[in-house]
Structure formats: structure tokens, C-alpha cells
Amino acid sequence: MTPEQRLVRPKIKPLRLLLSWLVAAAALFVAAWIVPHVEIQTFLGAVVVSLIIAVLNALILPLVAAIRLPLTLVLGFLIVLILDALMLLAASGLTDNAIEVDSFGWALLTALIASAVTVVLDVLFGTNDDDTYTLRVIERIARRSGERIETEVPGIVFLEIDGLALPVLQRAMRDGNAPNMARWVAEGDHRLAEWEPDLSSQTGASQAGILHGSNENTPAFRWVEKATATMMTCSAPADCAELERRHATGVGLLTDGGASRGNLLSGEADHVILTVSRMEAEKGANPGYRAFFSNGFNVTRVLVLFFWEVFLEWTAASRAIRRDVRPRGHRSGLYPFMRAAMCVVVRDLIVYGVLSDMLKGRPAIYATFSSYDEVAHHSGLERADTLEALRKLDQQFGRIDRARTYSSRPYEIVVLSDHGQTQGATFKQRNGYGLEDLVERSLASGDVTGFSGGDEQNAMVGLAVSEATGADTSKKKPKNDVSDRQVVVMGSGNLGLVYLMEERRRMTLEEIEGRHPALISALREHPHVGWLLVRSEKDGPVALGGGGARYLEDDRVDGEDPLANLSPNAAHHLRRTDGFADVADIMVGSFYDPQLDEGCAFEELISFHGGMGGLQTRPFILYPASFTLPDEPIVGAAAVHGVLRGWRQQLQGDKIAG
């Protein structure tokens, strides 16, 4: 699927240009009809005004984007919005009654409404997939920046869809919700493969393994390091930086000139945008956003689509309540705005970062898109609005695919996921109380502190906000001291962690039963708990269930096997996790029902990941047919790193280290 390297410049198509011009004129004409104190007498006048604005836009905004202004996101948005209004006022002054605008404020409102109408008309007339103008500007910025690399050595683009399971992708391909990826497979250009994540099936652990080759001692999304009584979280910038420091060994996937876009960890990339572990490097101005601001329509379009996404979420949530859809997640408060930020703003910034990287010829690019994961958590993994988020991602992948024709080197595209998701009503919805409540009432003594909620999407939006304002939040210390807590209970999807802080080391099964006689039995016998991982002083690591136990050192089963409904590799994953320095005193896995394909999260997410059971352990790799996979199954994120880095070395040989 790699295009022959031709260093072709994007060419403007006259008919497409004419149609876009007429669409812009129609949108402006409608906006002037809606907004008071703005008047366009005839459609011909709208055509003239739209031409003037197009010329001014082509002259001014690429210049603003190309010069080295300290472009934070907020400053860039404000500059473009102000220029949009000023260009309308300029058109009013340059024409003889083609348009009349009373003031700057009315001009700004007209520009916003015209953008909203343009978005609708672009979809109706099929002009929303033409990136020719944008690519021409990005290419010009790349050449003038001095960063453009022109070579025949192929590059590789890794596009991660956070939280998408292989069976969900296959059904989306079949049903028309992923047409670009379906076409790649149907034409024989790409193939699909499955891999299995580690016990902690969440982005922090998976990206540590995929991008750095190791995720040792990452037992969950959040965990306690008992020796220092500190809590680590895979979305806190300081903790992500520490996680990267522990695992970076010089063989990161993106070493030697690579680019990280929208990731928790950087893969040792030289170029980063929206990368949580490198927040210090990203504070303030980021030249990576110049491509986005090179076209004024991007800004107004993003604002329009942001509020449209908020409206879509409100209507979808209301429809779910009206139809009494179950399971049903919490979707009120700030969540609609969080969803809109992930599905529109962050997504588009990452796409433009990738397009810029390709036209500059970066050798390796890894970008994470979390909109599907975010919507699925609250709506369900295959609900209509969730699949619509996937369809929009697929549309963006089509843009990236088409941009290869104009890049300064050939590119291969690999699409993968870091984990899947499993669905089901939460533990609290089923029981009326949470895991922390169950633990607290089963203790002999002690107060329980529960931690759950929050995910990598919160981190990404927070990072975007801090970049937007130029604020330096990298030195803020996370509230992670748990030295004054007696018992800490954490939920990471359907994986629970119980830390008994009375000892600064992991307690054995015998110690726990001696000090808290009711705790283990209350947990293992609960109908919505599938297994417990504890360490016995006598028997070593053991998985306990309501009807039996599996002794992991010799794989002996006594009674019913608590891991029977899980992957054949479940015991391997538990043995590995048991060896981590900071594994919890008690690791708790929810039940999994293979008939209904459901489990339950220990946090308030109806579609979840983080543990074992169901589609959360079935992520995918969509790879070029010219690449080869190992003969053995791909188990663990570090194994994926080996595959992806091997493909990069296959393309680039000794151009990368290691």
C-alpha cells in the first residue's frame, strides 16, 4: 500500500475548488440571512465576498502559522477567530455593497455561523474529504522549517485506537462503520491479527510495553508502592514521566527521529505533541500546532463540531434514559464536554500533527486516538454513538492514507489497539455498594480509602488545556501520599487492588486471615468476584475462587478452577503479576460470564478494561501484507514492541539504533 516515492505536491482540482467556493458562498449567504446587522443582497455578492476571504485566508494565515510566534492553543484560536472577523470587515470595505457588517462582534458571529453551515454543506456535497489546500500549506511550512527529510527509506505510521477489540472492529468493517480499514483488508493490502495484553489491560501498561519494551511492575492503572506509601497513576504527568524513566533503555519504538502524538509515554521520541510523560517539554508554545492554524476554517470548524458533539451526547444520553437502555453509565455533568474534547479537539490536533510529521518525513510516528474508548466507557462498546466515533476515526485514517502520496518519503501504516473492552453493569450498580464498602465491612478494624474513576482521557484533555493556556503544571506534585491511610482499595476496570497499609510490605494470605479473618472469605465468595490473587507463605501465589483454588507454582487446582472462564494464559499473567514489587496484598478480579460476555467494573464504567475476561483481552493489529508476524501467539505488550520494532528495522535497517 506504500505509494511510489515521487515528491508530488498536492494539486488543486479546479472543479473541486469551484464547488468548495460555491459551498462557502452559500454558507456565508445563509449566515448573513440569520445574523442581524449583517446584510448580503444577492448570492453573487456572497460569491464575491467568499472569494475575497479565501484570498486573504490563503495569504495571511499560512504566514501567521509559519512564523515562529509562541503559539499556544488558546492564542492560536484567538488569533484565527479575530482574523476571521477582520477579513469579513475587510471584505465589506473592499466591495461596493456586496456585504454590510455593522461591527466586529456581528462579523465574528457571522463567521462562526457560516462555518457551521459549511460543515453541513460539506457533508451533503462530499467536499469534506479534500485536504489538498491544507496539505499544500503544511508542505510549505515543512520545507521552510528546514526539518523536511527527503529519502527513499520508508517511514512507518502507527495509529492506535484506544480500547477497540478485534471482533468489534470486524463487525464495524462488515457493517460499514470502518470503510477505509475494510477496504485495505478487502484489497489485500493489509491483514488482521490478534494479540493478548498483560493482566493490566489498560493504556499505561500497554504503552509502556509497546513503546518501551517493558511494563514490569505496572500492576494496574493506579497502584500503591507500599515501601514509600505513595500512589502511582498512569494519567498523572509526574507518574508517567517516572514510569518512562524506569522503562526507557534506548530501544524505544520511536528513537532516532520519531514522533509521539497523543500518547501517555513517548517511546523515546524526539518530537512530541500531547504526550503526558513529556509534559515538561511541551509546556507553553508548541510549533507542532502550526499546521492546524494554517487554515482558518480549522478553528471555527472545531468550535462548531465541539458543540455539535456535546449536543449529540445530550441527545444520546436522553435517548438511553427514555428507552431504559441497560447497562447505562453516568453521562451528565462535564462528561459531554470531555467527550467533545476527545472526539473533536484532541483528535484533530493529533491528525494534523501526524500529517505534518509525514510531510516532514519523520521516520516513525505513533499516535493514539482515544475517542472510541471514551465514548464506549459511558455508552457501551457497540452502541450507535460509539460506532459513530469509530467511523469518524476511520475517516481520519483515510485522510492520513491519502496524504502518503505527498509525503517526502514512502510510508507504511499500521493500525493497532492497546486493549479491548468488556461490557456489563458495574459492581456498584449490581449490589448497591462498592468494592471498598465490601472490604471495609469485612475488616476486623481499620478505615478504607477508595480510589477509582479518572483515566488517560482525563490526562489528555488536561494536557491539552495546560498547553492551550501555556500554563506550566509539570511541577505540581500529585496528591499521592497514602502514608496516613489504613486500607487502600483501588478500582482499575474490573481489576481491584486491596492494600493493607499496616505493613510496608506485601502481606501473606496467612497474615491477612490472622488479622482480618472475614476478609478473604467475604471477597472470594461474593457472586460478582471471580478470583483473588494472594501469596501464601506455604503455597506461594494462589488464585482463590468461591468454589476452589488454583496454586500457581505447580498449576494444581483444588475444587473449581477460578480461572476456568478466562484466557488459557490467565495463570501465566497472574504468576507474572505476583512477581511485581508493588502488587497489591489482594488482587481482585470480577466475575466473567462467557454466555453473556459480561463482567463488572469496580468503577463506574459500563464498558471497561484493566483486568481479564471477554473482549478487553482481544486487541488487534492491522498490518501491511508485506510484513510478517511471528509463528507463536503475541502475548504481552512487550511482545508487540518486538514485532513493531522489527518491522521498523525491516524498513529502515541500520538507520535506527538497536
Predicted regions: what they are:
Residues 130-132, 213-380, 494-500, 504-507, ...:
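His/Asp/Glu-rich, glycine-adjacent segments
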Residues 1-109, 119-129:
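Juxtamembrane/disordered regions of integral membrane proteins
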Residues 171-208, 213-217:
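Short, structured active-site-proximal loop/turn typified by the sulfatase FGly-forming signature C/S-X-P-X-R
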Residues 130-189, 430:
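Active-site-proximal N-terminal segment of extracellular/periplasmic enzymes that hydrolyze or transfer
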Residues 344-345, 349, 357, 365, ...:
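A long, amphipathic alpha-helix that forms part
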Residues 403-501:
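Acidic/histidine-rich catalytic neighborhood
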